[in-house]
Structures are given as C-alpha cells and as structure tokens.
C-alpha cells in the first residue's frame, strides 16, 4: 500500500514539473556569471594635489594652474628648499607679466601660504580676463613665417579672430603684411579688414599675438561678391594671355581695364578694392594697383605694388618688368587723362609729376627721357571679345 502511494506521488510530481514547462519559455532564460562593476578611478580617487619642494616645481605648478584655467588651486609644500615667500612673489609676477599665456590671459593673481616650509600649503587665486575656450584656442607656431601663413589662411577663410603663440618671435609689422597680402590676392580675399593687434608680453622670445578682424560684409555675402570678382578676373586673364610678349600682355591689360569699363572716381580708400573697381565702377588708385598686380602675376609678368604719394596725397601704382627693364605704370593716371594706351613711366617722369615714394626700395628704371612704349596690342579674337564686362553697379 505504501509503495503504491509513493509511486502515485512520484507521478504527480513529474507531471507538475512538465506542466511548468508549458508556460516557462526556456529561450527567455539566461544565466550569466555575476561580475562586480569596478568604480572609475576618477570616482574613487581625488585628483592629486601638486607637491612642491623647490622654486622650479613651484613655478611649474603655478603656470599649470594658469594653462588649465584654474581659478583657485591648492599646492602642498614639503621641505621646501629656499625662501618660499620670496619665490612665490617673484613667480606670480613672472606668471602674470612675463609668461606669454599668463600675460595674455590673467588679470590678477594672489597666493597665501599657511603652515611652514616643512609642511604647509599654498592657496592660489587667479582672476582671468580670458575664458578657458580662448586659452584653448591659442595656436602655437615656431616662428614669424609660420605665423604669417596661419594669418593668411585666416584671411582667406574670413575668420574674425586668431590668437598665436609665436616662438622665436622677431619684431614684425603684421598689420602691413596683412594689408599687402589682401591687396596682392584679390582673387582670394574680397575685403581688407580692420585689424586689432595686441602682443603679450611686450618683450620676450616667445610672444602671444592676438588678432581681431572686422569686415564690411558677412562671410556668406563676401563669398558671393568674391565669385563676381573672380569671373571678371578670369576673363581679363584669358584676354591678356593672348599677348605674345611682355609688351603686348601689359598693353592688353591696360586696354581691358581702361576701355571696357565705365568708371567714377572714388575719393575714399575702398575696403573692397577689386569689387569696387570691377563690379561697381568705382576707380581708385588702390583698386587699380591691386587688380593690375593680380593680373600681371596670372599672365606671368613681374609686378610690384608701389605705395607713395602724388601731390602730397596717398597714391598707389605698379612697377612692371618689361623685357628685362623696369617701368612704372599708373592706371589711375590713365583713367584720369582718358588715355586708352599704356604709358611706361620712369622715375624721373613720376617725380616731375610730384610723385613721391621710397625709390631705393624698388629696382631702377631706365634713365632715358622717352622710354620705349609698347606696341598697339593685337585686337582680340571673337572668343576673347566675349569676355567683355560692364562695371556698372550690381544689385
């Protein structure tokens, strides 16, 4: 009897287990070993406080606080070798007035020592005049030439600001370099920006150069306007390059710029020289000098922009090399006199007309009173005639 009851219980238990399998889906069950999640080191350990034992370590720690934009920092002092109070005062002065990044970024810094030189702490307080983002955006370059390349790219991109840390710094007129680059590359840069430039510190082998650029138009608008300028410059290049000799190419360029456009004389110096000349018909000596330079370079003619005065007023013109001889060319003079053909001018002729410029900075021109004039350029073909443009104002 007992044996029969045991058998019945065993059967019931077996059925119960198999019944469970009808509603518990084995494919939804998984067993994985438990892994203890480690806590990141940054959550278990506080950032280690800098420890200083001598002047060099103290200086490095203070400069590190500045570079990391730390407004309030703690330094631990242990068995300090030297006069920590005197060193601290000198280092703070250096960090805020002589160190390039400190001179650029810090308005004021102070520190307080508690304890002793054997076991103490220094609390450093820094007031920044630059944001952490501004410090982080500083670009380090090896010398002035590398700095100028960065500046040129910023101008091409129409950037509004650039901060450079220049090693092996040499005294340079960066504002003049910027202006020259803009004038020499009207195909890349539409406007000569207003420039704000500051150097930090005032003296030193390594300096911070902070530049800000202000433009007359938005970046998108300037790109559209530059496209219009390049359309006309490309047409001029195609026309000028039909000339076979230096003389012919120079004469064709003169004819393109003086005969194919209707100009009004502009009194104010333009901030967008090529656009004002080619797209709006505003004639200024700066505009002519810039466009002539760019077109001469494109046509393989040696050319320079000359800055000086005429009748005591600022004036710009060009120096061209024609078949190995140098001559001055002033297209503004041609427009004012309604001259359709190119006139090659010597230094003597310019001085007779009250031009003044640093003559020794440029190659000498022939001493002959009547320099050879270029021949009449060959009339353009029908293909080059199609490049004609009007300089009437655009909408």
Regions found by a protein language model. Give the residues of each.
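Secondary-structure boundary elements
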Residues: 217-278
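N-terminal accessory/pre-domain segments preceding catalytic cores
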Residues: 19-243, 355-395
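Sec-dependent N-terminal signal peptides of Gram-positive bacterial secreted proteins and lipoproteins
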Residues: 2-24
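Periplasmic OmpA-like peptidoglycan-binding domain that tethers envelope proteins to the cell wall
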Residues: 276-286
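Hydrophobic/aromatic-rich core segments of domains that either
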Residues: 287-352
């Amino acid at each position: 009897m007992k044996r029969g009851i045991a058998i019945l219980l065993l059967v019931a238990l077996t059925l119960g287990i198999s019944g469970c399998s009808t509603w518990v889906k084995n494919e939804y069950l998984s067993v994985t070993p438990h892994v203890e999640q480690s806590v990141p080191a940054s959550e278990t350990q506080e950032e280690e406080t800098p420890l200083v034992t001598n002047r060099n370590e103290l200086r490095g720690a203070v400069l590190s606080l500045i570079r990391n934009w730390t407004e309030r920092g703690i330094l631990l002092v242990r068995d300090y070798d030297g006069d920590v109070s005197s060193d601290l005062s000198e280092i703070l002065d250096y960090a805020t007035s002589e160190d390039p990044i400190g001179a650029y970024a810090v308005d004021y810094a102070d520190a307080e020592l508690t304890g002793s030189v054997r076991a103490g702490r220094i609390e450093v307080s820094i007031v920044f005049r630059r944001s952490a983002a501004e410090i982080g955006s500083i670009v380090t370059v090896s010398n002035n030439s590398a700095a100028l390349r960065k500046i040129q790219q910023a101008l091409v991109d129409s950037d509004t600001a650039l901060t450079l840390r220049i090693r092996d710094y040499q005294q340079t007129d960066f504002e003049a370099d910027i202006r020259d680059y803009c004038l020499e590359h009207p195909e890349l840069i539409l406007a000569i920006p207003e420039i704000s430039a500051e150097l930090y510190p005032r003296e030193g082998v390594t300096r911070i150069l902070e530049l800000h650029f202000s433009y007359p138009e938005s970046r998108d608008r300037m790109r559209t306007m530059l496209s219009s300028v390049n359309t006309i410059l490309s047409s001029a290049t195609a026309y000028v390059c039909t000339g076979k000799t230096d003389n012919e190419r120079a004469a064709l360029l003169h004819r393109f710029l003086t005969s194919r456009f209707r100009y009004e004389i502009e009194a104010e110096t333009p901030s967008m020289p090529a656009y004002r000349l080619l797209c709006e018909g505003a004639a200024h000596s700066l505009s002519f000098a810039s466009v002539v330079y760019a077109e001469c370079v494109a046509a393989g003619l040696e050319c320079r922009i000359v800055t000086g005065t005429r009748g005591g007023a600022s004036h710009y013109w060009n120096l061209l090399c024609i078949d190995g001889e140098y001559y001055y060319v002033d297209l503004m003079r041609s427009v004012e006199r309604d001259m359709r053909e190119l006139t090659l001018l010597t230094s003597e002729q310019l001085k007779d007309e009250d031009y003044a410029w640093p003559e020794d900075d440029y190659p000498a021109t022939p001493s002959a009173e009547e320099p050879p004039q270029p021949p009449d350029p060959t009339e353009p073909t029908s293909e080059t005639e199609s490049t004609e443009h009007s300089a009437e104002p655009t909408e």
